Amino acid sequence: NKSKKRRNRVSFLGAATVEPPKPIPLTWKTEKPVWVNQWPLPKQKLEALHLLANEQLEKGHIEPSFSPWNSPVFVIQKKSGKWRMLTDLRAVNAVIQPMGPLQPGLPSPAMIPKDWPLIIIDLKDCFFTIPLAEQDCEKFAFTIPAINNKEPATRFQWKVLPQGMLNSPTICQTFVGRALQPVREKFSDCYIIHYIDDILCAAETKDKLIDCYTFLQAEVANAGLAIASDKIQTSTPFHYLGMQIENRKIKPQKIEIRKDTLKALNDFQKLLGDINWIRPTLGIPTYAMSNLFSILRGDSDLNSKRMLTPEATKEIKLVEEKIQSAQINRIDPLAPLQLLIFATAHSPTGIIIQNTDLVEWSFLPHSTVKTFTLYLDQIATLIGQTRLRIIKLCGNDPDKIVVPLTKEQVRQAFINSGAWQIGLANFVGIIDNHYPKTKIFQFLKLTTWILPKITRREPLENALTVFTDGSSNGKAAYTGPKERVIKTPYQSAQRAELVAVITVLQDFDINIISDSAYVVQATRDVETALIKYSMDDQLNQLFNLLQQTVRKRNFPFYITHIRAHTNLPGPLTKANKQADLLVSSALIKAQELHALTHVNAAGLKNKFDVTWKLAKDIVQHCTQCQVLHLPTQEAGVNPRGLCPNALWQMDVTHVPSFGRLSYVHVTVDTYSHFIWATCHTGESTSHVKKHLLSCFAVMGVPEKIKTDNGPGYCSKAFQKFLSQWKISHTTGIPYNSQGQAIVERTNRTLKTQLVKQKEGGDSKECTTPQMQLNLALYTLNFLNIYRNQTTTSAEQHLTGKKNSPHEGKLIWWKDNKNKTWEIGKVITWGRGFACVSPGENQLPVWIPTRHLKFYNEPIRDAKKSTSAETETPQSSTVDSQDEQNGDVRRTDEVAIHQEGRAANLGTTKEADAVSYKISREHKGDTNPREYAACSLDDCINGGKSPYACRSSCS
């Protein structure tokens, strides 16, 4: 009956007769009960808890419970002396699926039309009037303990939204929003703001406002909600969401900032968060709070000590003054909004106005993402940010944007600035530079550093040109009319070069050329840039000094970048090299001195204090200083093994997507190109040994391994490991990866295959890094067949099967040392290279294919070829397909030859069968003499040669 009477009353008031909204169920991550034990409570608090629980039980907010869930409960005493019950729901919140916020920000009261009458109401105990879904009630159970456990504890569970539940605000907003929806539909010309349980209604006339409020009362009651009668506001000044609202003006509510509680980072973080929240109303520019923001720097521990500096104290006083005096205006709904951009110090300031009435302030963050942010880019970013804010406030773009730039500067910004193009994308309003005549903005501290005045984008005519350089040894230098070397405390080449640039930025026209792109970009941008604070004090000092130096100049300058260590001709490269020489490291100086004087290793070590290994490497890799070394290879030739497991190359590459296992150790057999790779957490000797043991299990044990000069490969532990397995070890040229070209190419091939599998593969079961590697290796070794091959790498590795049609053929090969052409036999042929047997008692020679010619092809006069370097035989006419991939295959004859050499047995009969050479007297003939065809069955030419056979065929 009561419900029927209530519905009749609501109908009489004119509201729609609808059922109250149904409870909104929660989504749970788990149905496993969460039980957190109740802690003991003092007797006084326990008595207060019993009273509060009985009160809630009478109101129907809780009910007795036998739930397997439990959350601790406690009470606090208010200033008025009353007690308040709270539930610790942190454990329960952890298993609730968040609903997400429905109102991510506070509504702006400035959008309330000016001079419209208002009514503001507050819903009474809003959470306690919204029911929980029946199935969710048991999850919010709590226990009231008994002293000394002398009786069973009393247990209850919430039937309404509990305070502190993760989704209570969202459910409350949804519930109240549904109740207000009929009001919004019927009174669409009224302006209604609803935030949690606070509701503001505005209408053009008082009569319409009363009608709207009457209907709203009925709808709220119909939804089971209650209005707090003591919190209804009907006259100015209104207080809503921390603001004092008058007929036309809006002011922040008067507050006092307590400074005695500011002792730790957390205290200052909260204070600045609150100040930032009301800054759009206060209008405090970013530069006026820089000292307060600086206090947040340093240790990120919330309890770390912080102190209020005198400068920051002044800024807090400014905030308090602004709170007392600042005000913004309610808008005219029929007039458009405009955006003014002021070029204030530190960063620009935006102001949203309507006519000359201030609506809201807009600021950029104090800290930036980039180290240098150009002032023009900051203006563009602020425009884009404030345009979005205006659209959010009223649903429209501003009618006009006023910027501190001329029309020509605006035109250039559209052409040259990507940030400007983004900030003003799709803007169809007016861009102007005429500010309204009003005194309310005159307090702003403006800057003149908007666009560059000193820095030029084009070289200066008739100006001095200076080259700068820096080194990690702390030396900086510049060259020009005079040279100078400057000692700096920095261990960074870029920082040392910054010192050189600052030094040469004297007050006269100058063109600066630097080989550091970092320094060039910093110097170009620093004039108008906001410099991001860095924890590195040295870097801060350098950048600030650079900016001050540039801004103090009276004459323009130009700076550009030049690539270092190139062999390009011209005076720029020469002059830059001269500057580089002034600061080059000990190793570079040692290499340059040896190239000039060919001093021995001991002399290099003594003069430059380099290690013995580095000194010996410099000498050993000098072609003029080699006295007794293994034969050097021709340019473009990377030695291969002549049979499986003869020579491996090994390296470490990085695959970032593997996470901790990003160090991928790669081994490739240079004969078969069989690849094996394993992923590890590092590249130390222990990781290398683990990788090699894996390789031995798959590929076998090699005779020789070639690596770079990494610490993991040069350690004593690794050498001992190799000696145990009877493996010889060589390294490439220090700091030069060309000696390991095969494995470097393999790294790229492997990474490409991994990318293909990741982006286009269907093998979702390959979840771990090693599984992904294994799939890639299986494809490369057992499935792929490369051009000019007939078998896979796995078949070649396991069987040693021949794979090139040119193996065993007679060829002419060019001896670059003697400038002569010799005859030989192909042992193996790959992409751009070949291994040739030059004759008896001689080791095989690796030669680029451009220095080869098949034996049955026409040849020019041997005498002329010997005497005139320009008259060489035609280059090999081998199809380019024969030079693919560089895979090598052995012949049985070469195997015999190698085995004999390895055993130091000298020349054997079998070795003679494959080691041959045209006699010396043939060299002088225009055409080699012809002899009868050889009749021996084992003739190396198959008995078909028109020339004489030597050695065992003679």
Swiss-Prot record:
Coiled-coil annotated spans: none
Domain Integrase catalytic, residue spans: 640-801
Chain ranges of the Reverse transcriptase domain: 57-245
Superkingdom of source: Eukaryota
Intervals of motif LPQG: 161-164
Protein family per UniProt: Belongs to the beta type-B retroviral polymerase family. HERV class-II K(HML-2) pol subfamily.
Role: Early post-infection, the reverse transcriptase converts the viral RNA genome into double-stranded viral DNA. The RNase H domain of the reverse transcriptase performs two functions. It degrades the RNA template and specifically removes the RNA primer from the RNA/DNA hybrid. Following nuclear import, the integrase catalyzes the insertion of the linear, double-stranded viral DNA into the host cell chromosome. Endogenous Pol proteins may have kept, lost or modified their original function during evolution.
The protein's name: Endogenous retrovirus group K member 25 Pol protein
Organism: Homo sapiens (Human)
Protein's gene: ERVK-25
